[in-house]
Regions:
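Gly-rich Lys/Arg/Thr-decorated short loops/hinges at beta-loop-alpha junctions or inter-strand turns
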Residues: 113-128, 223-229
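C-terminal functional extensions of proteins
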Residues: 206-207, 211-256, 261-292, 297-371
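Short acidic, glycine/serine/threonine-rich loops at helix termini
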Residues: 105-109, 166-170, 193-199, 268-271, ...
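Gly/Ser/Thr-rich loops at beta-strand to alpha-helix junctions
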Residues: 99-100, 158-165, 188-191, 264, ...
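Loop/turn positions that initiate beta-strands
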Residues: 88-96
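Active-site histidine-anchored catalytic micro-motif
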Residues: 154, 172-175, 179-226, 294
């Protein structure tokens, strides 16, 4: 049976009639003098709800929010969050350091509130990280089911341990059942998933963890097979790849962004090896995200966390917190993610196999209970 409805925090907007905010000046700007070079004292953005006072006297939220960016005012008076490398000579960039609104920029850090009855419920902004904290799989399952019903954009960020730990089949299930709208991963995830599909091993080992003869080269043979086909998509079409995560993404038309690193073998065709281009491709998805699940990958989780706002704007519900779930066997990663500024993240300290298996069963029960 389905549990009680998930408690959702209510967003309370700032009182712009208060003396300080009503009398605040329009956010000052300075002109960019050279491409990619920000003015001194540029305002550095956070991932929290932010408002900018325009020259028309109105407070508005900038578009495409993220942390570690700047605020650029376009010719129509609309404010956008942009990475510093993207500014161009002549752009108007907001300057100032104050976040309390007195200089025309307000970071509304405490806008989300729970009703008293739900004060002790599972939620994101105040979640602490501990391996001793029980995992409320039902609440996470409810989130996923709600997002699918609303046709949200759920991003999954995956590390290779997900493939090695037998959680692969469960991720395939989530993809095939409409719970994944984008997959962000590195070359290794795709390589070992495809190795499993073609050779039947990951890192040369069977699903029981037993080494195979010549297994050290299995991943290279998988890469070579995809290179022969020309692309991952072509390898699915010609049935070189007949199952697994990448196969499911291609068949279900789920976009995937594979980013390279200095340690990669191959890489596979389609892997983005330019770090800035990879960031841009990932950012195209984080701008659309309504939920994010990160599993067993430190660098990718932190990179995506840096791009995610803590909220998004829903046409029906207004400003909504962006649920971000970070799963890892180590408390270090999930704590590090929060320390780096992804305050909305809920840390789940467990291994990928257990998490994916239990979550799938719980989601299936949630779907059955809603019928």
């Amino acid at each position: 049976m389905s549990g009680s409805p998930r408690a959702e925090p209510k967003y309370v907007a700032p009182d712009f009639r208060s003396p300080m905010l009503s009398s605040a000046p329009a956010a000052p700007t300075a002109v960019v003098e050279a491409d990619g070079v920000l003015p001194d004292n540029f305002f550095a953005t956070t991932n929290l709800p932010t408002y900018v006072k325009g020259t028309n006297g109105r407070w508005a939220m900038p578009r495409e929010p993220r942390m570690d960016g700047c605020l650029v005012r376009d010719v129509d008076g609309v404010y956008w969050v942009r990475e510093g490398r993207r500014v161009r000579r002549g752009d108007a960039v907001v300057v100032g350091l104050a976040e309390d609104g007195r200089e025309g920029v307000l970071v509304h850090a405490h806008g989300f509130h729970f009703e008293d009855a739900a004060h002790g419920d599972f939620h994101f902004m105040s979640s602490q990280v501990s391996r001793e904290k029980p995992i409320d799989y039902r609440q996470i399952a409810q989130l996923l089911v709600e997002e699918r019903k609303r046709e949200g954009h759920v991003l999954w960020v995956a590390g290779p341990a997900l493939v090695h730990s037998r959680a692969r089949d469960n991720l395939v299930w989530f993809i095939r059942n409409g719970f994944v709208q984008g997959l962000l991963a590195g070359n290794a995830v795709a390589v070992h998933d495809i190795e499993a599909a073609i050779v039947g091993t990951t890192l040369g080992m069977t699903s029981n963890g037993e080494p195979t003869v010549g297994g050290h080269s299995a991943h290279m043979r998988a890469i070579n097979a995809v290179r022969r086909a020309g692309s991952i998509e072509a390898a699915v079409t010609n049935e070189t790849i007949t199952g697994g995560i990448m196969h499911a993404c291609v068949i279900e038309h789920v976009p995937f962004i594979l980013c390279g690193s200095i340690r990669d073998d191959g890489p596979l065709p389609g892997v983005i090896t330019d770090a800035v281009a990879a960031q841009d491709a990932m950012r195209a998805h984080t701008k659309q995200a309504t939920m994010c699940v990160m599993i067993a990958t430190a660098l990718h989780s932190i990179a995506v966390g840096n791009m995610l706002p803590a909220y998004y704007e829903d046409s029906q519900r207004g400003i909504v917190e962006l649920p971000t779930i970070c799963v890892d066997a180590s408390e270090f990663l999930v704590s590090k993610l929060k320390d780096r500024g992804t305050h909305q993240a809920i840390g789940v300290v467990t291994n990928a196999q257990d998490f994916m298996s239990i979550l799938r069963v719980t989601v299936e029960a949630e779907i059955a209970g809603a019928r």
